[in-house]
Amino acid sequence: MTVDVLIRAVNNPTSAQDLVKNVAQLAATKDEQAIPTLVEVLKFNNPGAAVAAVNGLINIGEAVVPYLLENVDGYNYGARAWMLRIFAGIGDPRALDLLIEAANKDFAFSVRRSAAKGLGNIQWHKVPDSEREVQQQKVCDCLFLALEDGEWVVRYGAIAGLEGLSQAIPEARKIVIKNKLTEFLTTEPEAAIRARIQKAILSLP
């Protein structure tokens, strides 16, 4: 089926299950023409279809980012939460400020976790040299704050984010992250988090 036919199928499903199937088929095309329709699906009350749309949009990649930034829905929280997951999955630096705010301030812990983890996935080579150090410091500060989150899954995401960030920063900054994680290891009550910290520390020099 052509992309046009698949788009019409998404817009005219016969059931909730049919919608999920149609979205998955459209997402599998990885066609930029599908972006507006897949983004619209995020506003539907159908988590299965939304997950398929999110995965499809992440697979399309950076071409999705400008459209998403123009269409972030501040009034539809569910759609906004899905969009943040897409930004986190793509790692485009144009969404940095949104991810930083979400990691520390979003009321849903699942969104905070996704944003924190996604901050370790930023494509730093796309950030101008003159801005990179400042932006990386902002991300580092954000993730250090996320380590204090009351929800353990957010702390877990922050550790993954710091581990990812450490692969893109100067050695001196890696030492700062390693020292912070070593300190955090002594106060973290959750065994799963402590194990994740130890894994992250081992990946650092």
Curated annotation (Swiss-Prot):
Encoding gene (name): cpcF
Keyword Heme: no
One CC-aspect GO term: phycobilisome
Listed GO MF terms: lyase activity
One Pfam family linked to the record: HEAT_2
Sequence similarity: Belongs to the CpcE/RpcE/PecE family.
Annotated organism of origin: Picosynechococcus sp. (strain ATCC 27264 / PCC 7002 / PR-6) (Agmenellum quadruplicatum)
Name the UniProt record assigns to this protein: Phycocyanobilin lyase subunit beta
Keywords recorded for this protein, A-Z: Antenna complex, Lyase, Phycobilisome
